[in-house]
């Protein structure tokens, strides 16, 4: 099943994009399909000291409104863009902020906002 979501990215001078945090060496363009390197990761620790494990994915945000809210946390906004994406195999990120999801596959459709 294909859903829609949004992704905040860094916009490069040549018009391509990069992830903000992980896999920053990878650049991509609109209409590209990106597939997550699914592996087990951890976000934090349980009270007993054990790691909270989860299946990783590509971070996406459920709504444009939440993207705009999260964009405010970045000091530099002039090189950011919000991309409308088709997303597949989406799940809530454990212990993530509201609306933050993990997708196994995203297709970058349209740049809808440049701050």
Describe the residue ranges of each PLM region:
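Conserved NAD+-utilizing ADP-ribose enzyme module
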Residues: 1-58, 64-115
């Amino acid at each position: 099943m294909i859903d829609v979501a949004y992704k905040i990215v860094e916009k490069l001078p040549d018009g391509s994009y990069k992830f903000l945090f992980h896999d920053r060496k990878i650049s991509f363009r609109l209409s590209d399909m990106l597939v997550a390197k699914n592996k087990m990761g951890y976000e934090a620790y349980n009270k007993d000291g054990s790691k909270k494990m989860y299946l990783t994915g590509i971070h996406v945000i459920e709504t444009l409104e939440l993207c705009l809210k999260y964009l405010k946390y970045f000091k530099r906004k002039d090189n950011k863009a919000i991309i409308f994406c088709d997303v597949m195999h989406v799940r809530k990120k454990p212990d993530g902020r509201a609306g933050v999801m993990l997708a196994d596959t995203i297709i970058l459709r349209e740049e809808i906002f440049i701050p």
